Amino acid sequence: MTTDHAAPPALRSSAGARSAGLRYGALFGPSVFGVTAAGVALPDVATALHATPSAAAWVLTAHALALGVGTALFGRLADSRSIRSSLLLGSLVLATGTIVCLTAPNIGTLVAGRFILATGSGAMTSGALALSASSAPEERSKILSGFGATIAVFSAGATLAGGVFTHWLTWRLTLVLPALSLLAVPLCLRAAARLGSGRPLDLTGAAMLTVAAMSFLLLIQTYALGLPVAAVIGLAITLTLSIGGLIWRVRSSENSFVPRSLLSDRAFRRAAVTGIGVYAGLFAAMYAVPQILVREHHWTVLAVGAGLLPGAVVGAVLSRTAGRLTGGYGASRLLSGIAAAMVVALVASAATTNAASLVIAASLGFAAFAVTQVITTALMSARIDPARRGGALGLLNLTFFVGGGVGSAIAGALVKSMDLTKILGIVAVFPLVAALAALTLGKLSR
């Protein structure tokens, strides 16, 4: 897999590389609200719609899964047709999901609306990643610096935004905050005009991958959801069949949704492991930390959001630094150091239940999230042919989001048998894996 071809002129921003990075970050950033901000609203959702806690949890689970699938699917659409087509169709899907969520009369309709909304939000994330990856090599580091700084601000401010909208307005607005990406779409269309390759989309493969991911997440939450034995067996069979079908699809088709050449790329596999560790640690922390601060330290939701805001500053600075360090060992060592520091903070939180260590752990998770996007986008952009970058980055981010779903699902399953603070010590294994895997990325990026 090669390449570092210069981007077509149509993809270069006339307003400068840093401005382009900010616009692409504004396109991607609101997707973060779909999980972290929405989590703040779950108690109000359950009360208003008379839903059980396990049913309300699907407001987050369905969103995380659909966001990953949408990112991969619209990434392939961008490669096949154009980034512009992907953004326009995704905008329609995102707007439709927003309307469904705002008018949903019950929890089932709301979950369906969130699935639609997240699928459209996936078009925004894949578009932002594809635009960043398609920039000229000499501009890419500056674009990625601005991109990473912007999404760091969104990620750290998500809980505060969720608290403000839920407390002062309505939980329904909190659940549709990802629709803010629509405001950035017109600012990115000019750069998204390049035509795609025209290769067909493998919708069958996409469906198999979606079913496999959903079955896997449901199996992890078997205990928490109280699923009967028959349902568990059915899910296990579905997972086995969908994985088997996907493997057959990969081996039998050159245009499969998951390209064989991508799976054989060491850089892709190592980047996936790194991102899964970071996202799983962050999602698990965002499940537990706000609840601990509210229940045990008696913080208000607004105080939790405000306390996590410094993470925006840390993440913005570190992601800009990572953007300048791409192409060598510096960026991978930076990410490894951040992930390792998160491990220490999570273990300290489990041991002491100190509020400061809880805030630091979550803030480091935000920083690792932003830096991971910068490093993995730069790494894959230099190795993947431009005509396949959108799909490759979409699939990579699908693994990240499924990893995040695994982290929150494990934390949710363990909460029935142990304290939230103890859970933090267990989920620290995720950023530990990321810290070790990140060290292997530097050699691949040279």
Task: Identify the function of each model-found stretch.
Residues 87, 140-151, 198-208, 263, ...:
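Cytoplasmic-side transmembrane-helix entry/capping segments in multi-pass membrane proteins
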Residues 115-151:
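Cytoplasmic helix-loop-helix junction between adjacent transmembrane helices
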Residues 145-159, 399-407:
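Glycine-rich segments within core transmembrane alpha-helices of 12-TM secondary carriers
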Residues 16-79, 84-97, 110, 119-120, ...:
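12-transmembrane solute porter fold
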Residues 99-103, 186-191, 244-247, 347-351, ...:
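Membrane-embedded alpha-helical segments of multi-pass transporters/permeases
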Residues 163, 167-273:
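Hydrophobic transmembrane-helix bundles of small-molecule transporters
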Residues 99-100, 160, 164, 218, ...:
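Alpha-helical transmembrane segments of multipass membrane proteins
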Residues 1-16:
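Short, Lys/Arg-rich, polar N-terminal cytosolic tail immediately upstream
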